[in-house]
A protein has these predicted regions:
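A ligand-binding cleft/hinge motif common to bilobed small-molecule-binding domains
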Residues: 66, 82-91, 137-141, 170-204
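Alpha-to-beta junction loops
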Residues: 55-56, 73-81, 124-125, 161, ...
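Immediate post-signal peptide segment of exported/extracytoplasmic ligand-binding proteins
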Residues: 6-37, 113-114, 119-125, 254-259
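Periplasmic-binding protein-like
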Residues: 25, 100-107, 189-227, 245-259
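Acidic, polar ligand-binding/catalytic clefts
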Residues: 47, 51, 56-120, 201-202
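Extended ligand-binding regions for polar small-molecule ligands
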Residues: 43-52, 111, 119-133, 209-248
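Extracytoplasmic small-molecule ligand-binding "clamshell" domains
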Residues: 11-82, 158, 223, 238, ...
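Ligand-binding cleft/hinge of the Venus flytrap
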Residues: 47-54, 134-158, 188-192
Length: 259
């Protein structure tokens, strides 16, 4: 009986004993390459979850817009790529929340233009990574709050990866970059003061989750169980402290999902 259950539990994972994840490994500090190996918060998080299930984890480097199609095409068991939980995404996949975050605005330190929120972006060139969840919100804002009120639209430039957006900012192809708060902090540190964060408050607060296929209850249940087990460990607490990140509370799940 037990053996049958064990083999059943492995049946829905691509490789027995392994959680295969799709990750866009260009997005420090969540997932990035370090000495030829995937590193970062999401990578360590999944390792901890896998270990608590007696499994190992593998991250398959995949560009962000290809993650959901890859998941649906069974190239991997889950997506593990700091993916924001949105109503749009929940129509096509299920998501398991594990982190709370939001966006910040970054500009060159010596720029006169230092917007604090999208209201100051009408008529300006803004750079962002393609496929991000807040893009629709920004486009809608440009239409409803800029154009409809007789102001020039926000010019939004999309780039394949986040570092390319920062490059565009440095070369003045865009005037500001909107990116995840943790990524923004990393960019400021890495560029040693060449860029600054100009927004105080978190824009578009969201939950981040692992993506799982809707028709795959085995993987979903295993991930939820692994996360629950891992969250009770010191290692989990230390992981959040190391990255200065915020774990998800039951309250967050209620309020942010409602919004």
């Amino acid at each position: 009986g037990l053996l049958a259950v064990a083999s059943q539990a492995n049946a829905d994972f691509i490789k027995p004993g392994v959680i295969t994840a799709g990750s866009d490994i260009t997005f420090a500090p969540y997932e990035y390459m370090l000495n030829g190996q995937p590193a970062g918060f999401d990578i360590e998080m999944l390792k901890g979850i896998a270990a608590s299930l007696g499994k190992t984890s593998v991250n398959v480097d995949t560009r962000f817009p290809n993650l959901i199609p890859g998941l649906q095409g069974k190239r991997f068991d889950i997506t593990n790529s700091s993916m924001y939980i949105t109503a749009e995404r929940l129509k096509v996949i299920d998501m398991i929340p594990y982190l709370k975050t939001g966006e910040k605005i970054v500009t060159l330190s010596d720029s006169k233009y230092k917007p604090e929120d999208p209201a100051e972006m009408c008529g300006h060139k803004i750079g962002t990574m393609a496929g991000t969840s807040f893009l629709q919100g920004l486009m809608k804002f440009s239409q409803d709050s800029c154009v409809a009120k007789g102001k020039p639209a926000i010019t939004i430039s999309e780039y394949p990866t986040d570092p390319q957006v920062t490059q565009a900012l440095l070369s003045k192809a865009v005037e500001a970059q909107i990116t995840d708060v943790a990524v923004a902090q990393g960019v400021v540190q890495r560029l040693k003061g060449r860029v600054v964060i100009t927004s105080d408050k978190l824009l578009y607060p969201v939950l981040i989750g692992f993506g799982v296929r809707k028709d795959d209850p085995v993987v979903k249940k295993a991930m939820e169980e692994g996360l629950s087990k891992f969250s009770k460990t010191t290692q989990y607490k230390q992981l959040f402290e190391k990255y200065h990140f915020t774990p998800v509370t039951a309250e967050d799940i209620k309020t942010i999902k409602a919004s």
